[in-house]
């Protein structure tokens, strides 16, 4: 396969893999592995940090629990976490948290070492240089420190990882169970996974739900295949089909909010819903900083997992070329 990159140059598949700092690349076609390669000392058993692909697991878990009647996604998060009443989350619903359309002011600019994202990451030990005696000690303490709002609820789409942390709090309060145990019971075990997954937690055991999961490449492919199959895996319905359909289709409001955002140019027909990226009606993605992606192409029956180690968290050229690579491969095999 020859691929035209974002700069207009033609590259071979092999060169594109190398230039986008790939650690592993796996292609499923109709549920079968047709390509699998590992780089940089990775192997099929290796766990890799998936960053914000973690969010997509959380989104699917919310769909499962909502279907079981644990909560209604129209409900405010403060019903379950009343401590948040006096914060920027006071009017946030489970749905607006899922869709990154909530009101809370939160800066997520990975190139700014003092932004809110890195301050939250510091709570779980990712940025020890940002920790001092006055720093929040738990993820809940951090959320309670966010008092301001940057918009009205559902006014616009703005990607903020802390909203996924709040979803984790809601899940734990509504179920009286740990998020990691629920992920294991409702998703991980049902995918017949090869390896255990690992998730980063704060001192209370609450997971860093927006970024903290680690898993092997093949197990992420299983997750992608389940989404491709409308929520089923090996004939078992894991996530309600209606949840997958609703996520994929969105509506004009979702697309308008996305088009006006910083991410709009990336996917002109796209939207973001239920912690999933949707490029168009056929292609869905789970995406994490430093180049982590699950690409799901409904039209061609392909799932591609690409783990990467970009030099910078959100390099627009590298992400653009990665998305071109994934779309080209998924439409060619």
Q: Language-model segments: what does each one mean?
A:
Residues 39-43, 47, 310-313:
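A short acidic/small-residue loop/turn micro-motif
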Residues 100, 163-170, 211-232, 292-308:
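Active-site-proximal alpha-helical segments within enzyme catalytic domains
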Residues 31, 49-73, 97, 167-171, ...:
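Active-site SXXK
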Residues 49, 67-109, 145-148, 174-211, ...:
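Active-site helix/loop module of the DD-peptidase/beta-lactamase fold
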Residues 1-43, 98-99, 103-105, 140-145, ...:
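N-terminal leader/targeting segments and the immediately adjacent pre-domain N-terminus
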Residues 283-333:
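Structured C-terminal helix/loop/strand segments within mature extracytoplasmic catalytic/sensor domains
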Residues 194-197, 248-303:
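Active-site Gly/Thr loop motif
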Residues 44-45, 109-112, 120-206:
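Catalytic-site signature segments of enzymes, centered on catalytic residues
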């Amino acid at each position: 396969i020859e691929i035209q990159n974002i700069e207009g140059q033609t590259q071979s598949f092999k060169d594109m893999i190398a230039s986008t700092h790939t650690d592993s690349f796996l292609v499923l076609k109709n549920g079968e592995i047709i390509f699998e390669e590992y780089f940089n000392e990775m192997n099929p058993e290796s766990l890799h940090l998936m960053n914000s692909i973690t969010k997509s697991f959380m989104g699917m878990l919310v769909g499962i629990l909502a279907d079981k009647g644990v909560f209604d996604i129209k409900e405010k998060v403060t019903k379950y976490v009343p401590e948040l009443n006096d914060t920027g989350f006071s009017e946030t619903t489970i749905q607006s948290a899922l869709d990154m359309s909530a009101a809370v002011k939160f800066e997520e600019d990975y190139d700014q070492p003092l932004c809110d994202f890195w301050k939250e990451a510091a709570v779980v030990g990712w940025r020890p240089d940002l920790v001092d005696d006055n720093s929040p000690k738990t993820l809940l303490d951090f959320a309670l420190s966010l008092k301001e709002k940057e918009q009205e609820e559902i006014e616009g789409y703005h990607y903020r990882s802390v909203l996924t942390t709040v979803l984790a709090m809601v899940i734990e309060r509504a179920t009286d169970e740990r998020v990691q145990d629920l992920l294991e019971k409702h998703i991980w075990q049902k995918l017949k996974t090869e390896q255990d997954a690992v998730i980063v937690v704060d001192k209370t055991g609450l997971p860093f739900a927006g970024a903290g999961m680690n898993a092997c490449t093949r197990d992420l492919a299983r997750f992608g295949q389940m989404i491709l199959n409308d929520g089923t895996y090996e004939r078992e319905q894991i996530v309600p089909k209606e949840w997958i359909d609703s996520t994929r289709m969105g509506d004009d409001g979702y697309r308008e909010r996305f088009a006006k955002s910083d991410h709009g140019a990336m996917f002109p027909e796209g939207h973001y819903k239920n912690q999933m990226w949707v490029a168009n009606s056929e292609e869905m993605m789970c995406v994490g900083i430093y180049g982590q992606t699950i690409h799901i192409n409904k039209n061609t029956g392909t799932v591609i997992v690409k783990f990467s180690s970009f030099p910078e968290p959100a390099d627009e050229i590298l992400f653009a070329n990665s998305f071109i690579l994934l779309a080209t491969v998924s439409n060619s095999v």
